[in-house]
Amino acid sequence: RAVLIRSDDQFVALQDRYMRARRAKADMFISIHADAAENHAASGSSVYVLSDKGASSQAARWLADKENAADLIGVGGTSVSLDDKDPNLSVTLLDLSQNAIKRMSEDAAGNVLQSLKDLGKAHKKQVEYANFVVLRSPDVPSMLIETGFITNADEERKLNSPEHRKRLAYAISQGVRAFFIEQPLPGTYYARSGNIAPAGVNAASGGVFP
């Protein structure tokens, strides 16, 4: 089940975006955008995950905030509070959580990027790393997807096409499904169904949208 962070064009503060995902107990957070560049020939999709620098700075902020410390940190349905822990233990627990989330984010982003490559050109051939605020959740795998360049006339036309947007959505969903099939998290559909993969459909064909 998908939960929208926003359903209209209202602005939502960057940190509140991933915090809403945490409150919804999301298994994954995906931020979807259209890219822009001064070079109007730039084209293709990109997928980003949080850089090591971003993870380190976020960990420091998280531990310094008493409200955050009382929150629950965990991966795959196992959560603990940092509020009653020795400071050194808190650092270790948060580090373990972040490392696990980083690996999961990278794996999921790699699957999504491959699925987008099947649909069309990729601007970057590999998953990129950046210190984007929306990617800083300490315990939810997160990625940011640039679906194409709105400054490129051809891609702007495609992005304005409902059919192309359906294909993009389907390609992204197939990449996410592939990740959960490979690494089913406790409590998810794929864990309950015994890791059974759905029949594959070529993203470029449009397919039948679930």
Question: Where are the predicted features?
Answer:
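Active-site-proximal helix/loop segments of hydrolytic enzymes
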Residues: 1-210
